Amino acid sequence: MGLPELTFSLEKAAGTVSARMSAGAVALILRDAKDNGVYTIHRESDIPAQLGAANVTAIKRAMIGYINRPSVVYVAVIATAAEISAGFAALAAYSYDYLAGPVDMPASDATTLSGLVKAQRKKRYIGKAVLPATAGDDEGTINFVAAGIKSGATTITAAQYVPRIAGLLAGTPANCSATYAALDELTAITPEADPDTAVDAGKLILVDDGRKIKLGRAVTSKTKLAATDPEMLKKIKLVAA
């Protein structure tokens, strides 16, 4: 499949007003010593006042969106020593489209979240997890792989940036694609040596076209299809539809 050719469509401009107004919900699991609990965030003033700076930044990144802002951001704040599964369980009563984890999330947490989402999707759960470097081979796991991310003088890890990606995907209307969505705040990345191979391996990557840094082809981590599986399981837009 690889990256798409740089062709442009008028679909965005031709979309209906109702479709443009549509936006999904984001859920974040964050670890913090204070303000533990679940919060519903519609605006920056809803962010708990005592959260650490990195967690506040994560929420603000999730709120940026793309064509639209996310309809809402649900934030489960768990204790610093709590299991990631506790945050997932705390969000069980909430309906959301994209989930992201703590900004310092280790690989073990990402693997756990991928497994939890995969199990829940068998019960008609619609959420998808945006996780750093997690090859889940599942339509419910979005494997965000990026390095050398910079916004001016600030270096950002993939784990710190997944809330931004989750918010961008949630802010993409159903009649549009997140492929080549511009990330205007970014100034540098380490480019993939072979972008097409990365995309075919189920990696959601960043690309630099020399003018802007953008999202690559909007794919899920699904790479192996059974005989009865449709090709659309590899594409975020069609899985989300």
Region annotations inferred by a language model:
Residues M1-V145:
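Small-residue-rich
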Residues A89-A241:
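A glycine- and small-residue-enriched flexible loop/hinge signal that marks low-structured segments
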